[in-house]
Amino acid sequence: MTPIVFIDRDGTLIEEPPDFQIDAYEKLRLVNGVIPALLKLRDAGYHFVIVTNQDGLGSPTYPQASFDGPNALMLQIFSSQGIVFRDVLIDRSWPADNAPTRKPGIGLMVAYLQDRDIDWARSAMVGDRPTDLQFAENLNIRGFQLRTPQFGGDWDWDGIAHTLADAPRRAVVQRHTKETNIRVEIDLDGAPQARITTGLPFFNHMLEQIAKHAGISLQISAVGDLHIDEHHTIEDTGLALGQAVRQALGDKRGIGRYGFDPPQLPWQVSGAAAHGGFTLPMDETQASAVLDFSGRPYFVFEGTFVRERVGDMPTELVPHFFRSLCDASGMNLHLSVHGDNDHHKVEACFKALARALRQALQRHGHVLPSTKGAL
């Protein structure tokens, strides 16, 4: 789905003159900061639509020809910098006409309201007047009023671009079945912290490792049918956590995508004992994780456990948890472990995954890390 920034023209993209009509080339002035802000939003996946009231356009007091030349030059300037507008919607009525197509009315928006490919949750309206904020409210999207001497306002273009393009990646998932009731809250950019309650203390401890070593904020509350066994609680927690990660990532623009062990790190093992991926030791144990947020879930596990359970967590459910996590998050994960102590082996698996996640989740600009155009 595509987010759209709906943008007023006069006073928002271009400076508004005292007579409120840009009907001559010499009146054309771009608003400060608009081009770098729109480039940042474009790179974050936003499309742009101009929505403007032009009082009496086409009348003797505002001839169409006087409007067309400066408007075409404005669009050409933006286009020369890589900024293209998906549409230009113009209402030509007078305020006294009270037309439904005139902002803050949304009569010009019928086609967009019927478009199911628009990400309305991330879309926004930017303008310089209170009527632009009312327009945003009527569309049920966020509104930003640019700071101007004429109409006030609290925002500049740099702040708007930062707020929309660098928005925190958060998600809340509630999974309720006849077997479990699970709530996951995740903030991929929050301070590393964890509040975990699953009814399984060792499993809690492992999930805390993900939050700590991935560098994310994670809250999980799971109530399951532990009187039967642990399977449903562990499996459904993996599914809910995976769904939360997927939702928080959004369209995945700017992420590292891959989690692996950079070869220059001093703790990477070489030679016959080397394992591909993010490799870490825990005493006699060594675990490796390599992952890809490709959107194609796949899980490969290499390792064995001797004990039936570690604490209150059955060891057969360790790979099952990771498989559930992959299925719901759209992640491809290869995980391997070898050692002597099953406690160390389980914990090293969770820590290796977490460190690979840290790398894959980091943002580096706003470019989508795929040649296909979607992940």
From Swiss-Prot:
Its cofactor is Mg(2+). It catalyses: D-erythro-1-(imidazol-4-yl)glycerol 3-phosphate = 3-(imidazol-4-yl)-2-oxopropyl phosphate + H2O; L-histidinol phosphate + H2O = L-histidinol + phosphate. It is found in: Cytoplasm. Mg(2+) binds at residues 8, 10, 128. Pathway: Amino-acid biosynthesis; L-histidine biosynthesis; L-histidine from 5-phospho-alpha-D-ribose 1-diphosphate: step 6/9; Amino-acid biosynthesis; L-histidine biosynthesis; L-histidine from 5-phospho-alpha-D-ribose 1-diphosphate: step 8/9. The keyword Cytoplasm applies. Gene3D superfamilies: HAD superfamily/HAD-like, Imidazole glycerol phosphate dehydratase, domain 1. It holds the Pfam family Hydrolase_like. Its main location: cytoplasm. Residues 1-168 are annotated as: Histidinol-phosphatase. Keywords: Amino-acid biosynthesis, Cytoplasm, Histidine biosynthesis, Hydrolase, Lyase, Magnesium, Metal-binding, Multifunctional enzyme. This is Histidine biosynthesis bifunctional protein HisB. It comes from Xylella fastidiosa (strain M12). The gene is hisB.
